Amino acid sequence: MDCSRTFIFTNDTRQGLNNISTWWRKKFTDKIKFVGVTGSNGKTTVKEMIASILCAEMSQSKVLATKGNLNNDIGVPKTLLNLRREHVFAVIEMGMNHYGELTHLTNAVRPDVAVITNIGTAHIGELGSQDGIARAKAEVIAGLVKGGTLVIEADGKYAEYLTGQYDLGSTLTFGESSNAEVRGELDQSLGKQAIKIFYGDLVIDIDWFVNGKHNFLNALAAAAVGFALNISPRAIKRGLELFKGVDGRLETVRLRSGDTLIDDTYNANMDSVCRALEYLAVQPGRKIFVFGDMGELGEFSNAMHEEVGRFAKSLGVSLLYGFGTFAKQAVLRFGSGGLHFDSRTDLLNQLRSELNGQAHILIKGSRFMQMNLFCEALISD
């Protein structure tokens, strides 16, 4: 053993890492405002939007944010250990796939503001039902400081349930409906996008450059966090206008063939697939969907993949190419225009034969399916 180094012995390295990061985070109580971000979809995007807003208010050196999606019981402690005295804000993304995980993470972070982006069906195979997912996501409330703020979607199925779980501070809601405290309108006329955000008597006009209706809702969530932290309207506007999206999330690329690739390969669950399909459906020209398996669905796997096929057909998608064991169910449900492939090469060759310079190709699947390899191949053609 190298006796010139310091060693810490522990019976549980993960718990040991959590203990050290919790101790380190406590040194910054009353010095840094902490934001915790969780939800079934949009965690990383909302985290990046919030960070952009905070950097517009202060400077990048004063804001610590989770890198990428390091949001588990290793990533969160590693992020907390990067806290430094120059930081004013910390934006910590927290994920989970089983009960108790968020309780563990949020008690380390102790957020002043916690945002639950939405509650969908991600990890339903582990948690058994959407109600179970709601209970697991509500665990983030356990770590909220007294007098903190819980930010939730006003129109979400579990808004009332989540509000009832937090009685030590306030709740701030966001959404499109009139009952949302932070309300937004998306204008996609005249070939461009703009957002109006309403909060009390305040109106903020934002030029918007990010694809997808769901990202409009993500922007409202980020703005609500900004209001909860008393960030200036100027910084909220500038931060959202500077945000240009996250790699692998509805990222559009014009191919040399003239066709448009929609790279949404970062990950996939039922809700995010449906939102991506809705975006594909409003694009001009031929609509091609390359779909890889969705993971962690357990006993719901067959039914949810079938539903993707049905939904794609109902939206007028032209072709569905499935890749993976369960994607075959989507192809069968899609019917005419659906093909299943066991070989990446065969799928790519078939896809290339369908390109005509006017198609939109959406590629999506869970991370383990490596659907990004299809995108890389098309871009390199």
Predicted regions and their residues:
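Phosphate-binding loop of NTP-binding sites
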Residues: 9, 15-154, 160-169, 226, ...
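ATP-dependent carboxylate/acyl-activation modules
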Residues: 37, 247-249, 368-374
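Peripheral docking tails and interdomain loops at the edges
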Residues: 340, 360-379
